[in-house]
Curated annotation (Swiss-Prot):
This is G2/M phase-specific E3 ubiquitin-protein ligase. SMART domains: HECTc, PHD. It is found in: Nucleus, Nucleolus; Cytoplasm. GO terms for molecular function: ubiquitin-protein transferase activity; zinc ion binding. The lineage of its organism: Eukaryota, Metazoa, Chordata, Craniata, Vertebrata. It comes from Macaca fascicularis (Crab-eating macaque).
């Protein structure tokens, strides 16, 4: 027998590199010829500069004759490795006039390139081939399309780029393992599946592609798993009461798989899909596609002229935005496209926008007592970049000690959105429109408000929920295609004028009202000749358009520009139905089940404490506690509702041997007490949460007062 058993050769060193490592992925197969007392690594033998394959495949070692191997070892013994300074350097750089020699493992250590093709050339670290890109428009990090870990999209020895797909980046180690497993017949670009161009470039950059069948082709029942489809809902919040594994064909609870990888799924209802025919991608695949530039800015849709719609109807109910009328031939095609485009989950859309956030962090110093001014100063700082990750530190104004303490980003964004909703930049009770504030316009505050709102949405802030449908339609479809309603008018006197005009029953009554309001109508340019009673409808329409839209045109344009930060406005215009749910409507009320599902247990659970926790949530929901669901969430996270993009990190529960609960808003962690009785548990929870939130409000009022 010529070859040793695998166990016998483990301690034998390669005659070229003098290492006894047995690592096929790194050094190639380790082979020992017992008869000739010879052990070699395949790559060390293959890349040696002074040896050629003169025999047949079954002769010697891989076709290299034993006598040739001994001659090469003898030649290399006279050459010193420029890395480890030891003799036996059998590999030399092929660059002209370069005299560097090294062992194969030493070359790997110094990031040399070994080309496993042609003449099997090797290049030292100074002369190795490199990948060149003409421009780098990539964000700070992109995922390796094999392992999906984020990497810096800059070509280097360890980071390679696909020659056929601009958005495909790889770790060298991931590519090498992939090549060894796939072999020459199945090694190809992970995005476009190109093999010729891809393999040629990878060989140039030193990836070894063995001439063998794929490893999975050699396994028994290799394709058995392909006979089973992935049937599980993997979205963050599954809505199916039957569970994530429930699959009911031809219903809203049918499982739809990712069209890219097929290894993630969703119920149609959980991702707001109307039918099984609609395309759906999982978050991992969508992140890769998003960064490739596949998501193009959607064109703004125009509302049809509503000349045939009665003005009275506009006063009583909200206008319903519709797409332009199309020819019958294109209508069905576009409806299919719109079904896929507009029926998207808003949390998924915000997570997509969140891919822009870089690893670099910007610390914001925020005074909770003056949240607006400190936020304005932070966002206007020339070093602030909306795409940087936000870190919050709370400070106290006029504090001689200059103390600061870590703050919760989501709490800060929640406080900022609350201030924005109640600020003088908006008017209205619940559904708000932009106001006309000349000083705010002069200070560019409308732009800053739009910018803050965009940043809040992308960085995990709460749902604003206070936009009127009119303001929303102006942003999506344009002011020229939006008809305001009476509820949009917050000025009592103007609203009374509109009501009096609209309720006039005769031409004489109508003219009488117009005469009383003559100066106002002349000032806003809405005077018109009245000949019939129906003229009142056009007059009401003109007044509404002026007061709600034209009067605030300058603030609107400024606010709109701010919303373009991080591409938020473009996303709103592309998916209006999804964003309407968070811009025009308050989030759903919290329940015991929602909070129970929201918090995960990270530490070793205490069964009794967790039972008390679930009972406490139910008691709060039933009104048997002095706290509310919102109080609990604020105590633990700083937010009164679940942000559309979700919490980062995910809220967690810890069972600690303490008497009172502890809320860590920076980590979204709630430590619940371990008590002997449920009564003691509830009393301690109520007391701590109620008094903590009360104290925070009093401190805020105290600072404002000073």
């Amino acid at each position: 027998m010529n070859e040793n058993k695998p166990g016998d050769s483990q301690n034998l060193a390669c005659v070229f590199c003098r290492k006894n490592d047995d690592c096929p992925n790194k050094y190639g197969e380790k082979k020992t010829k017992e008869k000739w007392n010879l052990t070699v690594h395949y790559y060390c033998l293959l890349m040696s500069s002074g040896i050629w394959q003169r025999g047949k495949e079954e002769e010697g070692v891989y076709g290299f004759l034993i006598e040739d191997i001994r001659k090469e070892v003898n030649r290399a013994s006279k050459l010193k490795c420029c890395v480890c300074k030891k003799n036996g350097a059998s590999i030399g750089c092929v660059a002209p006039r370069c005299k560097r020699s090294y062992h194969f493992p030493c070359g790997l250590q110094r990031e040399c390139i070994f080309q496993f093709t042609g003449n099997f050339a090797s290049f030292c670290w100074n002369h190795r081939p490199v990948q060149i890109i003409t421009s780098n428009n990539y964000r700070e990090s992109l995922p390796c399309t094999i392992c999906l870990e984020f990497i810096e999209p800059i070509p280097s020895y360890n980071i390679l780029r696909s020659p056929c797909c601009k958005n495909a980046w790889f770790h060298r180690d991931c590519l090498q393992v992939q090549a060894i497993n796939a072999g020459v017949f199945f090694f190809r670009c992970t995005i476009c599946s190109n093999s010729d161009i891809f393999q040629k470039e990878m060989l140039r950059m030193g990836i070894h592609i063995p001439e063998k069948d794929a490893s999975w082709e050699l396994e028994e029942n290799a394709y058995q798993e392909l006979l089973q489809h992935h049937e599980r809902c993997d979205v963050r919040r599954c809505r199916c009461k039957e569970g994530r594994d429930y699959n009911a064909p031809d219903s809203k609870w049918e499982i739809k798989r990712c069209q890219c990888c097929g290894s993630s799924g969703t119920h149609l209802a959980c991702s707001s899909l109307r039918s099984w025919e609609q395309n759906w991608e999982c978050l991992e695949c969508r992140g890769i596609i998003y960064n490739s530039g596949e998501f193009q800015k959607a064109k703004k849709h125009v509302l049809p002229n509503s000349n045939n719609v009665g003005i009275t109807d506009c006063l009583l109910e909200e206008s319903s935005p519709k797409l332009p009328r199309q020819s019958p031939g294109s209508q069905s095609k576009d409806l299919l496209r719109q079904g896929s485009k507009f029926r998207r989950n808003v949390s998924t859309l915000l997570i997509e926008l969140g891919f822009q956030i870089k690893k670099k962090t910007k610390r914001l110093y925020i005074n909770k007592a003056n949240i607006w001014t400190s936020a304005l100063d932070a966002f206007r700082n020339r070093n602030f970049n909306p795409s940087y990750a936000i870190e919050v530190a709370y400070v106290i104004e006029n504090d001689n000690f200059g103390s600061e303490h870590p703050g919760s980003k989501q709490e800060f964004l929640s406080l900022l959105m609350q201030h924005l909703e109640n600020s003088s930049l908006f008017e209205g009770s619940l559904s708000k429109n932009l106001s006309l504030n000349s000083q705010a316009l002069k200070e560019n505050l409308y732009y800053e408000a739009g910018k803050m709102l965009a940043i809040s949405l992308v960085h995990g802030g709460p749902s604003p929920g206070f936009f009127s449908k009119t303001l929303f339609n102006c942003l999506v479809y344009g002011p020229e295609n939006t008809q305001p309603i009476l509820d949009d008018v917050s000025d009592f006197d103007v609203a009374q004028i509109i009501i009096r005009i609209n309720t006039a029953t005769t031409v004489a009554d109508l003219k009488s009202v117009i005469n009383e309001c003559y100066n106002y109508l002349e000032l806003i340019g809405c005077l018109r000749l009245i000949t019939t009673l129906s003229d009142k409808y056009m007059l009401v329409k003109d007044i509404l358009v002026y007061h709600v839209i034209q009067r605030v045109q300058a603030p609107f344009e400024s606010f709109k520009q701010g919303l373009k930060t991080l591409g938020v406005l473009e996303k709103i215009q592309a998916y209006p139905e999804a964003f309407c749910s968070i811009l025009c409507h308050k989030p759903e009320s919290l329940s015991a089940k929602i909070l129970s599902d929201l918090f995960t247990v990270h530490t070793l659970p205490d069964v009794k404490a967790l039972g008390f926790w679930n009972s406490y949530l139910q008691a709060v929901e039933d009104g048997k506690s002095t706290t509310t669901m919102e109080d609990i969430l604020i105590f633990a996270t700083g937010c009164s509702s679940i942000p559309p993009a979700g919490f980062k990190p995910t809220p967690s529960i810890e069972c600690l041997p303490v008497d009172f609960p502890v809320g860590n808003k920076c980590n979204n962690c709630l430590a619940i007490p371990v008590t002997n009785t449920y009564k003691e548990f509830q009393e301690n929870m109520d007391f701590t949460i109620r008094n903590t939130l009360k104290l925070e409000k009093e401190e805020s009022s105290h600072y404002i007062g000073h």
